[in-house]
Amino acid sequence: MAQTLNRSLTDLGALLHLVDPTLPIGGFNHSNGLETFVQQRVVESKATLEEYVQTQLLQNWIYNDGAYLSLAFDAMCEGNFDRLCELDWQLSATKVARESREGSFKLGVRLLKIFIRYETHTLLTAYQQAIAEKRVQGYFPIVFAMVAQAMGLSKADTLYAFYYNAAVGAITNGVKLIPLSQMDGQDILFDLRGSLVQAVELSFDPDEEWLGAATLANDIRAMQHEVLYTRLYMS
């Protein structure tokens, strides 16, 4: 009983560390196009921010970052390094907005730099070497999956944590940009609980035919962000 409890708490601690908002990777610097939506007054209220995050969650992330994370987790379980590299290349091709693409691999490289100090795993070492040799970029969802699997976390918990982290980031940025009250942000996060579970279910075994399915409005805003006159975020 005590051994099972200790293992469960250890896993929980590892998961909380992985999604810690104070990790020094620079995630708070990126809005991934949300800043453009706000400046264009498409997202301008509590209701429109919730709709934005809901759309990202169930029409974008489950076919893009979440799906790649899911497949990378499977590749880690199989010890398939070539597959991890292939997913990195595919993700690079499907992230069409330059700022979002560059932001993702910068976050991934920094995340790996932190956790490779604590997790001894041959695939993490090989992947870091591949990044150094510029054979892969090191995208955030792929590194997130690799680190979580190396920690011994479950795939469902990893997906939920990833989506939760992404949703919190979008809500926090929206609250700051619009602006809204902190309580509005908490209400949105509470309302998304069911959608977070749904996202995990939909991307647990992703259909590879849907990988990279485009959300055109978001991709366009992410590109337009490069030329905004004033901006708070890097993407």
Swiss-Prot record:
Main location: cytoplasm
Cell compartments where the protein resides: Cytoplasm
Pfam families, per database record: UreF
InterPro entries, per the entry: UreF (IPR002639), UreF_sf (IPR038277)
UniProt family annotation: Belongs to the UreF family.
Keywords linked to the UniProt accession: Chaperone, Cytoplasm, Nickel insertion
Originating species: Haemophilus influenzae (strain 86-028NP)
Protein name from the UniProt record: Urease accessory protein UreF
Gene designation per UniProt: ureF
Function, as annotated: Required for maturation of urease via the functional incorporation of the urease nickel metallocenter.
GO MF, one annotated term: nickel cation binding
Gene3D superfamilies associated with the record: Urease accessory protein UreF (1.10.4190.10)
Subunit record text: UreD, UreF and UreG form a complex that acts as a GTP-hydrolysis-dependent molecular chaperone, activating the urease apoprotein by helping to assemble the nickel containing metallocenter of UreC. The UreE protein probably delivers the nickel.
CC terms in the record's Gene Ontology section: cytoplasm
